[in-house]
Amino acid sequence: MWTSGRMSNAKNWLGLGMSLYFWGLMDLTTTVLSDTPTPQGELEALLSDKPQSHQRTKRSWVWNQFFVLEEYTGTDPLYVGKLHSDMDRGDGSIKYILSGEGAGIVFTIDDTTGDIHAIQRLDREERAQYTLRAQALDRRTGRPMEPESEFIIKIQDINDNEPKFLDGPYVATVPEMSPVGTSVIQVTATDADDPTYGNSARVVYSILQGQPYFSVDSKTGVIRTALMNMDREAKEYYEVIIQAKDMGGQLGGLAGTTTVNITLSDVNDNPPRFPQKHYQMSVLESAPISSTVGRVFAKDLDEGINAEMKYTIVDGDGADAFDISTDPNFQVGIITVKKPLSFESKKSYTLKVEGANPHLEMRFLNLGPFQDTTTVHISVEDVDEPPVFEPGFYFVEVPEDVAIGTTIQIISAKDPDVTNNSIRYSIDRSSDPGRFFYVDITTGALMTARPLDREEFSWHNITVLAMEMNNPSQVGSVPVTIKVLDVNDNAPEFPRFYEAFVCENAKAGQLIQTVSAVDQDDPRNGQHFYYSLAPEAANNPNFTIRDNQDNTARILTRRSGFRQQEQSVFHLPILIADSGQPVLSSTGTLTIQVCSCDDDGHVMSCSPEAYMLPVSLSRGALIAILACIFVLLVLVLLILSMRRHRKQPYIIDDEENIHENIVRYDDEGGGEEDTEAFDIAAMWNPREAQAGAAPKTRQDMLPEIESLSRYVPQTCAVNSTVHSYVLAKLYEADMDLWAPPFDSLQTYMFEGDGSVAGSLSSLQSATSDSEQSFDFLTDWGPRFRKLAELYGASEGPAPLW
C-alpha cells in the first residue's frame, strides 16, 4: 500500500505485516516533497531493500506523515492525501475506513479511492497534529484485508497571528535628569505562531511614538532614555507607543502595539526662591504670646520631600520679639509673637528670614545655593491698654487693733498709653465680702473699714481694680494679700472644766490636780502663762498652787484631815496671766470633791451634797396637768364600758334565712362507720360547728316529740332501737337552728364493712304491711309530707299545711 499527497518521509518508517507481526524497520533517505502522488512503482522501489529487478514480496502499509496548511479558506474540502493498499486492484472491492482523532468530523476518507480531505478549518494554534487510524476491508465480507495502522496529520503553520503584549498598557517611572541610556522598563510581546517554522514568530520591537526622549531595543524590548536632562518641571508625563512586528520586521509581517506611560519622578534640582523680597506686616501691641503675625513663602518647583522648607530668622532687631516656624502641610513660614509687645517701647521691627531645603542631592549642588532670604518689616500698632500696677503684687502686714480708717498701703497704677488717662481705684467686692477694707478712688490709699480680728480672720486676699476714667472698659487688677498681726487682746483660760477629788485621809502637800491654760492670741515669742490663787483665796488654808514654769500648774493640799460631813466640795479660784503687752488675766474655778479612799489612795465613794435644782411650778400649770390626766382616765373607762355592754345579735336575723328550696346533694356516705364524711350542717354554719354550741330551740317550728311514741310498735327490741335512733336524729335536726329547712334525698352507695347493726333494709316489721299504719307521719310536719302522702291512709282528703 502506498500513500501520496503532501508528505515527507521520516527517518524510520514502520511497516506492519499481515496477521499482526512486524516485517521490520526500513531506513529511508529520500524525502517526498511533491504535492502529487508518487508513482506506485517508484514508491515501492523506495520502500524495498532489494534491486528493483527482483520480484518484490507482499508488504503491509507504507506510511508517512501528512502535512496540511492551516487556515484553508477554499470552498471545496482540502485535499490531505491518499491511502492505497497493495491488495486494491481498482475494482472497488476494497473499502477504506478512517478512525481516530477528528475522523468523520475534521477529516473524511473516500472509502473507494482512499482520498483524505479536511472538511473543517484547521488552526495550528488550537491543535498542531491529529493521530488517526486507517484500515482496508473487504467490501463484500467486511473482513480486514490488512491490519489497522496509525498515521499522523500535522498542521503546517502560516503567519496568521500578530504579536501581542499581554501585560500592556505599561506604567513606568524614571527620575528626571537621568543620563542617556537609563533603563526605564522592558516590554514583551508573544506570537502564537510556530517559532520553529520560518519567521512567523520572530518579533522585532520598534518605537512609534516617544522619540526623541526614549528608545527601545529591537530584540529585548528594553526602553531607555534617549535625551539627557529631561526636566520634570518642564514635562512630567510621556506616552510612548511600542510596536512588535513578526517576520523579523520584514514587509508583510504582522504587528501589535502597546502604550507605555512614563512619569518623570522628582529630584531636588530646584532651589527655593522667595517671590517677594520684602514683606510688610503689622501686629497689635496687645497680641498674646504665640499669636500669628503673618506668613512668608519660598517657592520650590520640586515636590514631596524635595520641596520641604525650613525657615529661620537669621538677622534683624526682632529676633528676640518674634519667632518663625514651618507649616509641614503647606511649607510656609509662620511668624509668631515671642514676647509681649509695647507700642510705647518699640513701634517697628525688621526681620531677615531664610528659607532652605533640608534635603539636598550632591550632584545638583552646582545648580546654585538651595536657600533664599527675604526681609520682613513688622509694625506694632497702639491699642488702648488697661492700667498697669507697679508692682504687680502687694503684701501688707497690719496689727489687728488698727483703728478704722487707717491707711495700710498705697496702691499705684498708671495708664501705659501715650494719652495717660486718669485712673479710678476700687475693690472687687467678691474678694472682700466682709467689707473690711476700702480704697480711695483717686489716690489708691488702702484703708481699714472694720475692726480686724486675727482670731477670726488672720489673712485677707483682696483684689484692687484700676479703671480708666475715659474708658471704663479698660480695667486692670492687682492682688493684695493682707496679714493681720496679733495683739494681746485675749486673756488665758482653762481649756475645759476641771473637777478634782481629795481623799479624807490625804496628807499635806499631796498633788490632787495639774491644770493648764489656752490663749487665742499668737505672740511671736510663744505663749507663757503664770498661775496663782485669786486674791480672795490667797490665804486658802486647804489648798495651794505651784507654777511648773511650762504653762502648767500643780494643785496641792495644804493640810490633812478632810471630812465629808464637814464639807464635801471645795471651790478653788485660780488666777491665770499671760506674758503679753499689756498683761491679761482671767480667773478659773477648780471644783474639788472630798471622797472616801482606801489606804492606797483609791477612791471608794464620793457622797457630796445633792444639789437639787429648784423646780417650781405654778398652781395653774399643776391644775392643768391633773385635769388632763383625769380626762384621759374617764375616756378609757368609757371605752371599756361600751365594749362590755355591746348588744348581742339576734338568733334569727330575718325570715330570708329560712330557705324553702329543694337542693340536691350528690353526696354518697360510707355508712355508719364512715366517720370521715363531712357534715352539711357544719358547712351551713361553720361558726356554730366550731364553737360546739348546744342546739337551740327553733323559733319558727317546734316538733311534737311526745306524740311520736304512740305510733312506734313495741313488739320487737330491734324495732324499738331503730325507732329511738330515728327519734334522736329527728330531734337533733329540729333543734339545729342552722340546718336547711327542707328535705333532700340522699343515696348512700357504700354502707360500711362488717356493721354489727346490720343494714336498715333488712329490718322487718312484726306485722304485715296491711297492719302497719303510717298516719303518724302527717303529724311530723312539712318535712314528712311526701312520705305521708305515699304511705298514709288514703281515706279522706290529705291534710293541709
UniProtKB/Swiss-Prot annotation:
Positions annotated with a glycan in the UniProt record: 261, 420, 461, 542
Chain segments annotated as transmembrane: 620-640
- Membrane topology, record value: Single-pass type I membrane protein
Tell me the PROSITE patterns matching this sequence: CADHERIN_1, CADHERIN_2
Q: What is the effect of changing residue 416 to T?
A: In a breast cancer sample; somatic mutation
Q: Which InterPro entries match?
A: Cadherin, Cadherin-like_dom, Cadherin-like_sf, Cadherin_CS, Cadherin_Y-type_LIR, Catenin-bd_sf
Note one Pfam family from the annotation. Answer: CADH_Y-type_LIR
- Membrane keyword on record: yes
Q: Which UniProt keywords apply?
A: Calcium, Cell adhesion, Cell membrane, Cleavage on pair of basic residues, Glycoprotein, Membrane, Metal-binding, Repeat, Signal, Transmembrane, Transmembrane helix
Q: Which residues lie on this side of the membrane: Extracellular?
A: 60-619
CDD domains per the record? Cadherin_repeat
Q: List residues in topological domain: Cytoplasmic.
A: 641-801
List the Gene3D superfamilies hit by this protein, alphabetically.
Cadherins, TCF3-CBD (Catenin binding domain)
Tissue-level expression reads: Expressed in placenta, adult brain, and fetal brain.
Q: Where in the cell is it found?
A: Cell membrane
- What task does this protein carry out? Cadherins are calcium-dependent cell adhesion proteins. They preferentially interact with themselves in a homophilic manner in connecting cells; cadherins may thus contribute to the sorting of heterogeneous cell types.
Q: What is this protein called?
A: Cadherin-20
Source organism of the structure:
Homo sapiens (Human)
Gene name tied to this protein: CDH20
